[in-house]
Structure formats: C-alpha cells, structure tokens
C-alpha cells in the first residue's frame, strides 16, 4: 500500500474530526454541515478499502498536522492562503430537499464511474427538474454533493450521488451521469430540464429549454432508444 495514500487518509480523518468540533460548537453553516456528512461516508468507504481504523488514523493524522504546523512559519502560511484558489458552494436545493428520504416504486440503479445513479422507472409523463448542490472553482463545477430530480409536485424521482468508496470525480463524470439520468427519465415520456445554475457551471452556458448540450455518445444512445421505442409502438398497434 502506498504510504502517501495512508498518510492522506490519516490527515483527512483528523481534519474531519476538527470540522466536526466546529459543528458541535454550532459554528458551521448549512453547506459546511452538508459537506461534513458527505465526507464522513467517503472516509468510511476509504477506511474499509484500505483496511484502516478511522479512530487510529485520526490520532496519527493529528500528529502529522501538528508537526507540519510546528515547522510552518506564519509568513509562509499567509502566502499559502493568499495563493490558494477559493471554491464556492452553490445550492439549487434547500436543506429539506437535500436531506429528505425518498422511495422508488420501480427502482433502477446504475454506477457510472465514481457516481451512483438512481431512477424510479414508475414515473411517466411528468415535467421534471434536475437540481444540484455542488462546489465551484474557476467558474466550473468542482465537486458534486448531490443531484436530485423533482417533479412539479415536488416528488423526488431520481438522484446522482458520489460513491463513498470511490472519492473524487471530474466534471465529465458528472455530465455523463446527468446524460444517463436524463435518458432514463425520458424513456417513459417525461420532460426533463436542468437548472440554469447547473447548466452554467457544468456546461458553461444555459439554454431556455433547460437542456444541456449532449455528447456524441449520448446523442447516439438517445437515437437508438427512440428507434427502439418506435418499433415497440408499431408492434403494439
């Protein structure tokens, strides 16, 4: 096992512990708490994969951080903070929408890279909006926290979330997963739109019809889906 992988996990465990103390003292806002919950799942997955105990890793991570801070001068710390790009946290969903439990009548789940896609295949002929909470850096989507599909009535009918066991994903991973989710929902004659905020920071533009540009692979897949559906309709007639 690579030593850097282990030390990175140990430091992440300790930093999570510090952030938990901030929340316990009621000093964290909603996005801070949201990231804390997501990172907890990620750390559990990484710990299981690496075969490391989180509590023991936290103690070692504390020692690593204390050693670095002891060696770090105040001036160097100021320069590091000034040069580091700052990310922003954007929210399409409210805390209630983000944390609400939901159930699927006809569940379908698919893993697309480091992301998990869940769709309720029982939903038909609905207008659906995709909303997401995510971080942005350099005006581009950095990390997806959670994406959910909502009907006009407010019901959750689909979701994209990072896999705790596979931390880290790219903007292309997110766009591909959104394409899969849209295709799955449109299979049942649902009309799907993507929030303008998500369009802007994932695709760099926003369309009035709420549809992001599709990749050539997604276009070919949707064309095959449409042809298959036409054949089924003809057979039914």
From Swiss-Prot:
Domain notes, please?
Answer: The dsRNA-binding region is required for suppression of RNA silencing.
Q: Which GO terms describe its molecular function?
A: protein serine/threonine kinase inhibitor activity; RNA binding
Give me the ranges of the annotated region PABPN1-binding.
223-230
Cellular component, GO annotation: host cell cytoplasm; host cell nucleus
Q: Which GO terms describe its biological process?
A: symbiont-mediated suppression of host cytoplasmic pattern recognition receptor signaling pathway via inhibition of RIG-I activity; symbiont-mediated suppression of host gene expression; symbiont-mediated suppression of host mRNA processing; symbiont-mediated suppression of host PKR/eIFalpha signaling; symbiont-mediated suppression of host type I interferon-mediated signaling pathway
Ranges for the region named RNA-binding and homodimerization are: 1-73
Primary role = Inhibits post-transcriptional processing of cellular pre-mRNA, by binding and inhibiting two cellular proteins that are required for the 3'-end processing of cellular pre-mRNAs: the 30 kDa cleavage and polyadenylation specificity factor/CPSF4 and the poly(A)-binding protein 2/PABPN1. In turn, unprocessed 3' end pre-mRNAs accumulate in the host nucleus and are no longer exported to the cytoplasm. Cellular protein synthesis is thereby shut off very early after virus infection.
Chain positions of motif Nuclear localization signal: 34-38
Q: Ranges of Basic residues compositional bias? A: 217-237
Q: Where on this chain is Nuclear export signal (motif)? A: 137-146
Q: Does the keyword Ubl conjugation apply?
A: yes
- The organism is Influenza A virus (strain A/Memphis/1/1971 H3N2)
Q: Which Gene3D superfamilies does the annotation name?
A: Influenza virus non-structural protein, effector domain, S15/NS1, RNA-binding
Q: How is it modified after translation?
A: Upon interferon induction, ISGylated via host HERC5; this results in the impairment of NS1 interaction with RNA targets due to its inability to form homodimers and to interact with host EIF2AK2/PKR.
Which residue intervals make up region (Disordered)? 205-237
Q: How does it assemble?
A: Homodimer. Interacts with host TRIM25 (via coiled coil); this interaction specifically inhibits TRIM25 multimerization and TRIM25-mediated RIGI CARD ubiquitination. Interacts with human EIF2AK2/PKR, CPSF4, IVNS1ABP and PABPN1.
Identify this protein by name.
Non-structural protein 1
Q: Which UniProt keywords apply?
A: Eukaryotic host gene expression shutoff by virus, Host cytoplasm, Host gene expression shutoff by virus, Host mRNA suppression by virus, Host nucleus, Host-virus interaction, Inhibition of host innate immune response by virus, Inhibition of host interferon signaling pathway by virus, Inhibition of host PKR by virus, Inhibition of host pre-mRNA processing by virus, Inhibition of host RIG-I by virus, Inhibition of host RLR pathway by virus, Interferon antiviral system evasion, RNA-binding, Ubl conjugation, Viral immunoevasion
Classification via InterPro entries: NS1, NS1A, NS1A_effect_dom-like_sf, uS15_NS1_RNA-bd_sf
Q: Which family does it belong to?
A: Belongs to the influenza A viruses NS1 family.
Q: Where in the cell is it found?
A: Host nucleus; Host cytoplasm
In residue numbers, the region (CPSF4-binding) covers: 180-215
